């Protein structure tokens, strides 16, 4: 039976939150975690060029089956979360806004720390914006999320008068994902 390297990879990488590993590249965190666990690295399994899609072990065919301690390779990944808030007052006046947040990873490597199997992952990553950022935990999705809508009544300040009035507030959250995420199960050299 093959050795399970995942627990050692996860424990080591988790201990690096708030720190920079190696030269500070995203690759360094995964590579060092695998080496510390005694597993093979991308240098053992496949292309290692600056823009290569690294191979970190055995490919996991479905991300729902990825485990904590697996290595995640990104290619042209983008996650957009749009939160649309619409406020309707008794007189029919409507005010709304729709701010959005994006996570973009064109070519990136991370260590999976949680996978509840519902399209969400939590990863440990560094150099996530290309500025040698220290290791942190990030929640991402590997598939679009179902639209979530909540409706409440509450006091809201009107934009036109500046006065607070009771209003119906509808919040719609949409998450869309594009690009490729590939998980790899650590294995021996």
Where are the model-predicted features located?
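Feature targets compositionally biased, intrinsically disordered low-complexity regions
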Residues: 17, 21, 45-48, 56, ...
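Extended aliphatic helical segments
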Residues: 9, 17, 21, 50, ...
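N-terminal capping segments
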Residues: 1-44, 82-91
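Residue-level marker of positions within ordered structural domains that often coincide
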Residues: 18, 35, 77, 128, ...
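Active-site or metal-binding loop neighborhoods of secreted/extracellular toxin and effector enzymes
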Residues: 115-189
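...with weaker cross-activation on analogous glycine-rich loops/strands in unrelated enzymes
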Residues: 42-133
